[in-house]
Design a protein with these regions (language model features):
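Structural signature of the two symmetry-related core transmembrane helices
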Residues: 77-92
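Glycine-rich segments within core transmembrane alpha-helices of 12-TM secondary carriers
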Residues: 59, 135-155
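Intracellular juxtamembrane helix-capping segments at the cytosolic ends
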Residues: 115-129
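Helix-breaking motifs and short loop linkers at transmembrane-helix boundaries and internal kinks
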Residues: 41, 73, 95-97
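Hydrophobic core of transmembrane alpha-helices in multi-pass small-molecule transporters
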Residues: 19, 89-93, 99-117
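Helix-loop boundary and gating motifs at the non-cytosolic
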Residues: 2-55
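Helix-to-loop junctions at the C-terminal end of transmembrane segments
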Residues: 61-74
Length: 155
């Protein structure tokens, strides 16, 4: 039986999880390269190594943890725990004192972010959205990165 509309609970969960993920990715994408450069006088090679390591971590994590979350079937748990640890790992950057540790922590942060957001959240959206609503849901998801940039850059 097809639903007439998506519940308010679904929309609230969608916006909270998606916006949380987008704010965290925006922080990483806008500030971590500048952070490693300004805090440790990192070279272009150091910054490139961090970006490369983070990208590889994200790709592998999304594939592997996506399969794990499919097998386990508890996407909300992967999302909730992943987002919390992701946030804590971002806070940990305030206590880092070396280029190498920054690169390692960026990969750790990316692992939890990719698990929560890329693997579990995106699959959860597909699992909980009937085909007739996917355009509307994806439209909201597409707007949230822009809102996240305004939140991060604006204050």
């Amino acid at each position: 039986m097809k639903k007439e509309k998506l519940s308010g609970k679904f929309w609230l969960a969608l916006v909270i999880f998606c916006l949380t993920g987008q704010v965290a990715w925006t922080v990483e994408n806008m500030y971590f390269n500048v952070f490693i450069y300004k805090m440790f006088n990192a070279s272009a090679a150091d910054i490139s190594a961090m970006v490369m390591a983070s990208a590889v971590t994200a790709a592998l994590t999304t594939i592997i943890m996506g399969a794990v979350s499919d097998k386990v079937g508890r996407r909300k748990a992967f999302m909730s725990v992943g987002y919390i640890i992701w946030g804590v790992s971002i806070i940990a950057f305030a206590y880092i004192h070396s280029i190498m540790l920054t690169i390692v922590m960026d990969c750790v942060m990316t692992y939890f972010g990719s698990t929560a957001n890329d693997a579990a959240f995106n699959a959860w959206v597909t699992d909980n959205t009937e085909e007739q609503f996917r355009g509307k849901v994806e439209g909201v998801i597409a707007v949230l990165p822009l809102i996240a940039m305004l939140i991060v850059a604006g204050g």
